[in-house]
């Protein structure tokens, strides 16, 4: 008897095999060497099917589990035709063959599923979750601490240069003193110093009972400071402009605050921010970020969606972590409706007293000539406009000050200082918030909010709790992205099989 004779007609491996049979898999296997020696090669198409089915069936599957399943599990035997590659073979296949084509595989599988299931891509439910990285917990490097240490080292270098210049005054050589130094300059200074004094490192003394010469001490300090400065430069370079930390054991991981504080000390842990866009319960787009805030992840995720499908979703629905000026402007520029909550959305919509508070600047009436007036009838005049730091769309805040707060009967309710009250406003952002409230408080908005909590948060619930994928296994952003794509493909195939099974059962 054949293996398939032992399998139920609705078995997931048969659904999977029929589905994958409609996709041209050979085009993803470009990295396989054409010439080889030794034993006959395993069929790469069967290897690809086995890896993808492993992630479909298990959520996440390790290399050794793949090897074991091929020996004892009928489903894996069916896909591999009774062959059982070693875990090393699977590791080579995933890391060398699939690494460059995994995103294309994810996109093509999605397009086939979406075409079959008539998935609506205009409504995209967005959410993010932080997954702990495979890095040591106390291996942090802080960018600001490194910068402070570097500036302290600059001071030590200046002091050393002053001592050396005093020593070399008779030779005519002088080291330039600056506020900052490069490692290359210190190495060059050490070479010049060694050349002047004919220093031979083989003659250096070490240990107790030996007294170092001035030349030896200065030369060793120059070498030490150059090495230390080089280390600081490398650490700051690894952090980059957008990060403030990284892990020594996984340079791509950033230290973040994770909800599952199993250490019980509110400690930051190395992690990755995984972002997904869900359409009809399927993961339509996925991205891995090093940003701690979800706000910074929205635009890269939408651009990735556009690259994949050729358009932006009409209704991107997200929680309050995504509502920002930049993201609202981006939505307006690309024809997307504003259905992302902002930070104070809940308070604005549920706290009537706060929403209608007459002492909030946004509730001040605007009189003739566009003059803003407080409840006491005093005018607020524009003092200056201030650019918001780090905003790429040029967001500005307008700073207004009351003409005179002296003797105001509402002073205790209105302000906390003895000076005239000052308020900061951005009328464009205020109007955006009002548009978001109108969108989300409508019947359509309420349904979209409900669907987002079911589909987007539900997807992470399934991945983490039902399919037991709670922590990143690989290291390095490229390998982590490969792993997340495999998990996402497995989730979508798992969903597809369940829906097909329901249809077959109902029929």
Identify the role of each PLM range.
Residues 2, 46-52, 89:
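A general alpha-helix detector
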Residues 75-81:
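Secretory-pathway/luminal and periplasmic proteins that interact with or process carbohydrate-rich
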Residues 51, 59-72, 83-507:
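Anion-binding and metal-coordination hotspots
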Residues 1-9:
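Long, acidic, intrinsically disordered low-complexity segments
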Residues 39, 81-82:
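A Lys/Arg-rich helix-loop hairpin that forms a DNA/phosphate-binding surface
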Residues 9-49, 55, 427:
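Basic, short loop/linker segments at the boundary and entry of helix-turn-helix/winged-helix-like folds
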């Amino acid at each position: 008897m054949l293996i398939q004779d032992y399998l139920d007609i609705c078995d997931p491996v048969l659904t999977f095999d029929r589905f994958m049979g409609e996709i041209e898999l050979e085009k993803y296997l470009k990295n396989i060497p054409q010439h080889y020696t030794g034993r006959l090669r395993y069929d790469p198409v069967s290897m690809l099917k086995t890896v993808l089915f492993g992630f479909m069936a298990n959520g996440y599957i390790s290399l050794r589990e793949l090897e074991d399943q091929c020996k004892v599990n009928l489903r894996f035997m069916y896909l591999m035709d009774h062959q059982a590659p070693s875990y090393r073979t699977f590791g080579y296949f995933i890391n060398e063959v699939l690494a460059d084509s995994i995103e294309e595989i994810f996109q093509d599988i999605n397009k086939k599923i979406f075409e079959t299931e008539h998935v609506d891509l205009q409504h995209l439910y967005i959410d993010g979750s932080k997954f702990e990285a495979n890095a040591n917990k106390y291996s942090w490097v802080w960018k600001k601490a490194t910068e402070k240490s570097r500036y302290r080292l600059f001071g030590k270098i200046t002091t050393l240069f002053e001592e050396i210049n005093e020593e070399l005054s008779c030779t005519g050589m002088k080291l330039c003193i600056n506020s900052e130094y490069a490692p290359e300059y210190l190495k060059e200074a050490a070479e010049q110093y060694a050349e002047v004094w004919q220093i031979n490192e083989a003659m250096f003394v070490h240990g107790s009972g030996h007294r170092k010469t001035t030349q030896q001490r200065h030369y060793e300090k120059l070498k030490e400071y150059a090495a230390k400065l080089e280390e600081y430069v490398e650490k700051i370079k690894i952090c980059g402009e957008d990060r403030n930390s990284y892990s020594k054991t996984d340079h791509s991981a950033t230290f973040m605050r994770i909800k599952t504080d199993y250490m019980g000390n509110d400690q930051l842990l190395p992690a990755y921010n995984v972002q997904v866009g869900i359409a009809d319960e399927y993961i339509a787009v996925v991205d891995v970020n090093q940003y701690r805030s979800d706000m910074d992840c929205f635009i890269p995720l939408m651009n990735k969606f556009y690259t994949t499908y050729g358009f932006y979703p009409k209704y991107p629905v997200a929680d309050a972590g995504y509502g920002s000026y930049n993201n609202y402007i981006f939505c307006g520029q690309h024809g997307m409706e504003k259905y992302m909550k902002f930070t104070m959305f809940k308070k604005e919509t549920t706290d009537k007293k706060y929403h209608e508070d007459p002492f909030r600047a946004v509730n001040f009436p605007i009189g003739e000539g566009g003059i803003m007036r407080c409840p006491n009838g005093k005018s607020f005049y524009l003092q200056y406009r201030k650019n918001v730091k780090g905003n790429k769309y040029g967001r500005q805040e307008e700073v207004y000050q009351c003409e005179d707060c002296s003797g105001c009967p509402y002073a205790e309710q209105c302000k906390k200082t003895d000076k005239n009250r000052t308020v900061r406003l951005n009328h464009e952002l205020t109007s955006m918030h009002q548009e978001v409230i109108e969108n989300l408080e409508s019947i359509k908005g309420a349904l979209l909010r409900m669907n987002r909590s079911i589909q987007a948060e539900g997807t992470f619930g399934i991945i983490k709790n039902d399919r037991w994928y709670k922590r990143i296994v690989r290291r390095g952003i490229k390998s982590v992205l490969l792993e997340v794509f495999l998990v996402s493909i497995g989730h979508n195939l798992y969903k597809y099989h369940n829906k097909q099974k329901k249809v077959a059962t109902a029929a």
